[in-house]
Amino acid sequence: MGLRTLIAHALGRGTNTERPKAGQVVRPMAADRWRDYPADGLTPGRLVQILREADDGAIDRAMALYQQMEEKDAHLYAVARTRRLALTGLSWQVVSAADVHDVADRAGADEAADYCRKILSGIEGFGDALEHLSLALGRNLAVAENVWEFAGGELRLVDIVPVAFERLTIDEVGKLRVLTEEAPYDGIELPPNKFVVHVPHAASGHPMRGGLLRASAIAYLGKHLAMKDWLVFVELFGMPVRIARYEPSATPEEKRELLKMLESLRSDAAGVFSKAVELQLMEAGHGKTPPPYERICEFFNRELSKAWLGGTLTVETTGAGLERSSGGPGVHNEVRLDLRQDDITCEARTIRRDLLGPVARLRFGERVPVPCFRRQLELPRDRRELSEVLGRAVNELHMRVPARWAHETLGIPAAGEGEQVLSETVGAT
């Protein structure tokens, strides 16, 4: 940015951009090592209670429940990770506001983008922070702290630290607060320009009424109860029912002793009985219809897949008649493009508002065009067809196609200065 532009931004610097506090606000506490396990022995009544507590602002048990749900359910873990990796697996870039919006100060917008790009590239934990923010796709809330330090006489962003979910709470009026050593119970209000707050799918303005894990809780509970009954059934499946008949004159002590002998048959498969005892073994596991537990679990798995990925064919084809179909492998482990695009848009809006905005305005002033955060969404393309389209667009329609974009799209690196290049006649016949 030229001297004239820098002076203009400095003179136009408003008072809306408050200087954030240097250092880190959320520091480790002894209570951080404590952990709750609300998913253990979960019942419908307890689930309703936890969700209502979250609606009232006490979100710690709900967050612990969501974490346990992913840890204990392999299918839920798989679809949640697939959805998040569809976002975090894409490369990111900071683009000038002039490339997205019509701005008067093109030079200022480009300079702000270069500065923000340099700052983020120098933060080693920025990728980890983005992965932490992607957890909001399930919990619908994720927070990271911007750590500022004075360097060269100015306040500069030096780190972005994820904030543990146990440190978050919501007050009576619905405002997010963070628990600190000074305020371990009620928390403090989030200082301006100090935190990145990602709430991708808030319902009715309340972050706890949205989120995929809340929608997945009922499916998780139903599957959990079915699995519990299924394991009990598997333990008994194939083992004969042991029945012993005793004489009417048998004493209570003899009856108890006989019961112990029957129980020993379960594990030891051996026992000693009197000749007067009639022992009968009834073989189990040969009913006309199989137990419904597997069908129940498959139903809830399909519900989870639809909620997270937008369909069921993206994770499973067995049982759907597509084991040998050409359509089965083509959709395996994919997220619907409209869902991924929505995740990209929500993330970009949060990063621009809570991260790039403060970084740019604290450096160049309130009027600087804030750069944009983008994910490079790579759609499958036929390179031969794309080459033909580019040829027509440039030669016939005279469109101004950026050379850098063409190189990236075609997967052909740009030649360096002084590097030998192929001539235009290569491949000609």
Predicted ranges, named:
Residues 181, 187-188, 291, 295, ...:
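Compact mixed alphabeta submodule
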Residues 153-158, 253-257, 281-284, 378-388:
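Short, solvent-exposed polar/charged micro-motifs at secondary-structure junctions
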Residues 83-86, 95, 304:
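Detector for short helical micro-motifs
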Residues 299-429:
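C-terminal helix-loop subdomains that flank or include functional centers
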Residues 2-82, 103-265, 275-276, 416:
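Structured, contiguous alpha/beta core segments that scaffold functional sites
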Residues 223-357:
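A contiguous, surface-oriented mixed alpha/beta subdomain in the mid-to-C-terminal portion of proteins
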